[in-house]
Amino acid sequence: MEFSVLMSVYYKENPEYLKLSLDSVIKQTVSAAEIVLIKDGPLTKELDDIINQYSDKYAGLFRVFSLEENVGLGKALNYGVQRCKYDLIARMDTDDIVVPERFELQVNEFIKDKELVLCGGYIAEFARDPLIISGYRRVPLTQAAILKFAKKRNPFNHMTVMSV
């Protein structure tokens, strides 16, 4: 089952986090068919250099699109969704590091349940050092719990979502 990974980066992103994030996407046990990276406005030279290095090293995997000015995460992602080649899209933030099995686990859920339209998961958060976990963000897992939770706030950790 082929899918796209959608990411948006802007000038304030930490270059080291971007590298760690891209490495974690590339080292998945199930590979994405494409990584759609939206440059949300002009970036620093260091961020541009990292994106160019990965685009060159993994030619054909990365599809990079540039917005002339920063429009914010929501609009940048909407722009990116329109450029994804596949109906199934995995979201990633450029400061997130995912476990190697994330895409495999999610794709398997879509294979098992043909009516599934979205799945996500918990996150472990860090402040500066990815090896030092500062907390966890757990979300409801059942449909009933999701519907109840959604009355108060978003029941999904958006950066963990894979959806059609």
Residue ranges and their predicted role:
Residues 1-164:
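Nucleotide-sugar donor-binding/catalytic module of glycosyltransferases
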